[in-house]
């Protein structure tokens, strides 16, 4: 039987999971960040990624609804504001739509979800189901992929600005905000997990939750790679560059 880890040992194990399985290791991101994709492939990435962005506040609302401690809810609800925005400030969803606009995608099509890859839809729905059905501790632990986000964001912004003349720093404003939001959120979630994963069984569950979340992110990139890189098998109703870049959803 495994021994109970100290909080710092648990953190080390969680960071090791991210180092091995976070989606910065996926070949599709290497192509994206090194300028190896064409405009249509970047459009496909942004369109499909919007489904994940759209569901982030839904995920956080599901977690929030299960929190009985008002102090905990006050902290967690900031995540929803970050993505939904408020009466005076745009949130992450609006900023992602600003990116898809800048890439030449029709906003109605993006928001409709009609052109998504099935793999994208299934991965995101699996994540929503996970945080709704698993324990609160597991749901919070699944958010710990944000520990690794600042590194990939830096690579993405620098690489896309260097290699793609159709991308501007203004279009990538979403990522600038995440450089401060993600560390704040992950620091809180990590402290919560280290404090509450106080048995061998709970520690195994939080590691499994992070492993699962990494697989959700990886699966989305698998779907993109198969459809838009190689072997190029696109779901018949999914986005097709050139044909659909300005298509308005029926």
From Swiss-Prot:
The gene is pqqC. Pathway: Cofactor biosynthesis; pyrroloquinoline quinone biosynthesis. InterPro entries: Haem_Oase-like_multi-hlx, PqqC, PqqC-like, Thiaminase-2/PQQC. NCBIfam families: PQQ_syn_pqqC. Keywords: Oxidoreductase, PQQ biosynthesis. Ring cyclization and eight-electron oxidation of 3a-(2-amino-2-carboxyethyl)-4,5-dioxo-4,5,6,7,8,9-hexahydroquinoline-7,9-dicarboxylic-acid to PQQ. Belongs to the PqqC family. It catalyses: 6-(2-amino-2-carboxyethyl)-7,8-dioxo-1,2,3,4,7,8-hexahydroquinoline-2,4-dicarboxylate + 3 O2 = pyrroloquinoline quinone + 2 H2O2 + 2 H2O + H(+). Its EC number is 1.3.3.11. Pfam families: TENA_THI-4. GO terms for molecular function: pyrroloquinoline-quinone synthase activity. Disulfide bonds: none annotated. It comes from Xanthomonas oryzae pv. oryzae (strain PXO99A). One of its GO terms (biological process) is pyrroloquinoline quinone biosynthetic process. This is Pyrroloquinoline-quinone synthase.
């Amino acid at each position: 039987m495994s021994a109970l880890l100290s909080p710092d040992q648990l953190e080390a194990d969680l960071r090791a999971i991210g180092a091995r399985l976070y989606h910065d290791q996926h070949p599709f991101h290497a192509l994206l960040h090194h300028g190896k994709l064409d405009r249509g492939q970047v459009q496909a990435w942004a369109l499909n990624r919007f489904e994940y962005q759209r569901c982030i506040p839904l995920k956080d609302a599901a977690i929030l609804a299960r929190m009985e401690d008002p102090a905990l809810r006050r902290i967690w609800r900031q995540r929803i504001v970050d993505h939904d925005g408020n009466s005076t400030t745009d949130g992450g969803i609006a900023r992602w739509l600003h990116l898809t606009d800048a890439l030449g995608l029709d906003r109605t099509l993006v928001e409709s979800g009609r052109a998504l890859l099935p793999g994208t839809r299934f991965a995101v729905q699996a994540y929503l189901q996970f945080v709704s059905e698993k324990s609160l501790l597991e749901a919070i632990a699944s958010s710990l992929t944000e520990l690794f986000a600042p590194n990939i964001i830096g690579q993405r912004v620098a690489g896309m600005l260097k290699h793609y003349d159709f991308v501007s720093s203004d279009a990538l404003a979403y990522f600038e905000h995440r450089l401060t939001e993600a560390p704040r959120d992950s620091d809180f979630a990590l402290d919560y997990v280290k404090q509450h994963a106080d048995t061998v069984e709970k520690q195994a569950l939080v590691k499994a939750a992070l492993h699962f979340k990494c697989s959700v992110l990886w699966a989305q990139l698998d779907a993109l790679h198969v459809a838009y890189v190689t072997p190029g098998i696109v779901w018949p109703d999914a986005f097709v560059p050139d044909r659909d870049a300005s298509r308005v959803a029926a």
